[in-house]
Each structure stands twice: as C-alpha cells, then as structure tokens.
UniProtKB/Swiss-Prot annotation:
Record PTM: Transglutaminase substrate. Rapidly cleaved after ejaculation by KLK3/PSA, resulting in liquefaction of the semen coagulum and the progressive release of motile spermatozoa.
Signal peptide location: 1-23
Classification via Pfam families: Semenogelin
Residue ranges, annotated region (Disordered): 24-118, 133-160, 172-585
Residues forming coiled coils: none
Organism, scientific name: Saguinus oedipus
Chief location bin: secreted
Name of the protein in question: Semenogelin-1
Amino acid sequence: MKPIIFLVLSLLLILEKQAAVMGQKGGSKGRLPSESSQFPHGQKGQQYCARKDKQHAESKRSVSIEHTYHVDIPDHDQTRTSKQYDLNAQNKRIKSEKHAAGSQEPFNHKQEGREHGKSKGDFHVLIIHHKRGHAPHGTQNPSQDQGNSTSGKGISSQDSNTKERLLALGLGKEQDSVSGTQRNGTQGGSQSSPVLQTEDPVHNKKPETQNSLQNKGSSPNVNETKQKHSSKVQSPLCSAQEDRLQHGSKDVFSKNQNQTRNPNQDQEHGQKAHNRSCQCSSTEERRPNHGEKGIQKDASKGSTSNQTEDKMHDKSQKQVTTPSQEDGHRANKTSSQSSGTEERRPNHGEKGIQKDASKGSTSNQTEDKMHDKSQKQVTTPSQEDGHRANKTSSQSSGTEERRPNHGEKGIQKDASKGSTSNQTEDKMHDKSQKQVTTPSQEDGHRANKTSSQSSGTEERRPNHGEKGIQKDASKGSTSNKTEDKMHDKSQKQVTTPSQEDGHRANKTSSQSSGTEERRPNHGEKGIQKDASKGSSSNKTEDEKHDKSQKQVTTPSQDQQSGQDADEEEDLLSHYQKDRHQHRSYGGLDIVIVEHEADDDDRLTHHDNNQNSIFT
C-alpha cells in the first residue's frame, strides 16, 4: 500500500502544480470524476465534449467510473480524440473503430460507456488516449473528444486518473491501478511521470485503435497489474508468490504459512557464548498391531535424540533405531551430550511410554512389550550435566528395563548428577527371574580438561514373551542401537551407532560408546566390541530358547581423561549364571562370559575405581 499512497500523493502534487499553470494559461481546471468538465467558452467542440462527459458520468455513476475527455485549448482547430476500450466488449470497440462519421460516434461512446457501467461491477478499465496532431479528415468531429495540449491535458487527465485510482483503492475492486495517464505513459514511454506525455499524431482511426490496443497489450490483464502491485505491498518478502497472485490467488500469508510449516524441523542454536549447546529434538512414534499404544517424548536441551520404533506382527519383531546426534559446541571447554532412545511395542493391547525431558542432556527410554502376556514397561532416566566454564563434565546414563511374561513389572529410574547409574531389571517367563545390575559411573573431570562419557545399555529378549531393550545415552557422543527380534528361534539385532561430537572447546575429549548385540539360537554366543575413543566396551549376551533364559549386559563406562573404570555385571538365572568380568587393558574392556549351572548365586565385585554391587 505504501507505493500506491506515495504515487497518489505525488500525482496530487503534480496536479496541483499543473492546475496553477492551467489557471494562468487558460483558466481551465482539472475535473473531478463526479463533476462535469469545465472548459473555457468560445471554442469549438467543447459543447460536444461536455455533453459526452455528462453522458458518461450518468452511465457510470453505478460503478463510480467516469471517462474524461479533454479539449485542447491552444489548438482548438485540431481534433483530439480520446477513446475507451473495454476488454470485455471488443465488439463495441470494433464498432467505434469502424464508425468514422461524427454523427454515429457519440452513440457508440454512449453504448460503450453504458456497457462499461454494466460489465464493470467488478472489473473495469479506463484508458484515455490523448492524441496530438491534425485530424485526418481535416474537420472537427463533434462526436470525437477534443484533446488538449500537454498543459491542459496533463492536469485534467491526471486529476481524473488520480480520483479513479482513489476510487479503485476505496472500493476494493479489481480495477487497473495504472490508470489512463499511465497508459499514456506507456505510449509515451513514461509511467512514473504521467504529466508530460508524448502524444502521437492521429492520422486515422485505425492507428489510434492499434495504439490503444498496444496500451492494452502492455497490461493485458488488469487483475495482473493490480495484483502485482498489491503483491509487492502486501507480501514484500514473498516474491515467489507473485505468479500465484497474477493468477488470482489472494490468500498470500496462509499459503506461505502452509508452505513453510514443517513439523519435523530440527532446531539448531548457534553458540556464540560459553556453555551453550545445540538443541535438536525429533520425536518418532510407532504403534504396532492390535490396539497397542506407544508414546515417545523427547525434549532434549543441549543434545539431540532420534527415536525410532519398529514393531512387527506376530513373533518376528524388528527395531532399528538410528539416532544421529550432533552437538556443535563452540564455547570454550564445553561438552556435548547425545542420547539414543529405542522403543518397541508388540501385539495385543500392550502399552509403552517413553518420556525424555533432559536439561543440558538427553535421556533415552526404551520400552519393550511382548506378545502373549501383555507386559508393561516404563523407563524414566533423567540426566543432568553440570557444565561450567573451563570445567565441564559430561554424564551419560543408560537405563535398561526388562519385563518378562505373566504381568511382571520392572521399573528403572536413573537420575545421575555428576554420575550415572544403570539399572537393569530382567524378568523371565517360566521361572520369573529377576536380575538387577546397578553399576555406578563416576566421571573424573578436571579443569580445562573435560571428558565426555557415554553409557550404552543393551538388552535383548528372545521369543516367548521375552523383551529386549537397548539404550544408549552418551554425552559427547551418539550411539545408535537397533533391536531386532525374530520369529521363533532366530533373533537378529543390528546396531548402527552414528556418533558425531563437535567439541570446539579448548581441551575437550569426546568419547562414544556404540553397543551392539546379537543373539543367535540355542545357546550361541554373541560378542560385541565397541572401540570408543579412550575406552571400549565388549558385551556378550547368551540367550537360549527352551529354557527362556535372559541375559542382560549393562556395561557402564567410567571415562576420565586418563582413567578407565571397570564394571562387572552378574546375571543370575534359574538355569544359568552368567558372570561378566570386565578387565581394563589400556582403555579396552573385555567381557568374558562364563556359563555355570548354579542356581541363585550372588556375587559382589569391587572394582579399582568403583564399588559396583550386582544383586
């Protein structure tokens, strides 16, 4: 609207100046659209023009459009013609072109003006052509308008055009904002300054008609001209939608919002100051067969978690979690945290809920519910990371829960501030076994030397109501875990850890733990090795079919910038006792799985740096 207002104001100023000039020259004034044209007396053809203007004013009062015709005061012996051509009434235009006689011309103009009044309920074009030169027939045609010279024509035509432009803006109709003076500017080569316009000599009727049609050809669609002008005013930032506005679409902002709206956008906050973290939250949720409910919520502040749930139908379940997490820390001495959350929900009305609301870190919750027994599992690990300037500590907590058949419940909560505790509950099918592993993780953080720790927790549950949960909540790294459960006796697990840790601080170390598990059939052994930066964890889980045994390996990594912590997990079952011994060799944790036939044994192991009690 601002360009239109400026243009109107500039035209009004120009009209006032030329009105003063015309008052000095001939005393003629610019005529308003509602007024009749005022011309000085004693000149030929003025009565006809005034009469014709009155007739147009009467025929166009319904739509407030008038056609102005002006008399050239200095050159009153020369004929000046001004014609109007309607886009919707081309046949009338042809008639007006064909009739050269002056007696029939006013009737054509009357009919043309009346049909403009009828056809312009929503659309009208006003073209005023000021022709200069001698008449081709050498006679003054009373049916033709008497044009005027540059001074008189400029005032009256611009005044009427300005008024019509104001009417077009006030009525809100789709009319040509570029009025007759700008059409004349199109002929003369000037639209911005319609005061001084080059006038073509009228040799006959057809050149005038062609010139007027060329003026139409310059803007063939009045709606396009109006909408182009309005699109620049209403949506200056949306230049891509001028094509739509040219084709009649007026809802600019709603279409912009519909186009630019993306519900799965990742939000990245660039860090310019110290101790800032990138945030990127993407929540994925999958619901399997038979009315199951799976809810995952991930609101991570300072980290990124991607959750993927894949649920299969009867007995073959496959889950692929590929969280790609990027922490761009540009502050001095910052740590990045990432968490991978996996969730699986089987058949028959089971419910699984994951919530992850971590401030400065990301906690991953994994719920796995199985087929026949309709188990329920809720994991809520909360992670807190104390990041300070020049002294930052990164903490990661992996929470694992396992719930077997027969309506058993296992709840794990991990709220570690400065440390991470991993709890694993394993409940079995027939014998209803329970196994809790609680390794406590300690992070030795030194000033100007920060280390990021990641704990990968993996669980797998075989067939017959078993559950497998993998969790990887790594700070300063990202681990992607994939749980794959197969049909009867064959289980498959694919772990794809993509870990990206952008530490741009002075003296920061990022460590990533990728956990992979694979469980074959009938007492086979699967060994996982993870060579992380500064440490590696190897996990071995052995699951068997007939006895419905379950083995949970929860290695928690204590990573100091020069220290490796040992963790041991003892998994007790009624049929087997799995003894995991972690031996640290310069940053490598080797897991040796020994299967014994003892029942209900408990073992307490004291590490060098930790006291991990496994019950």
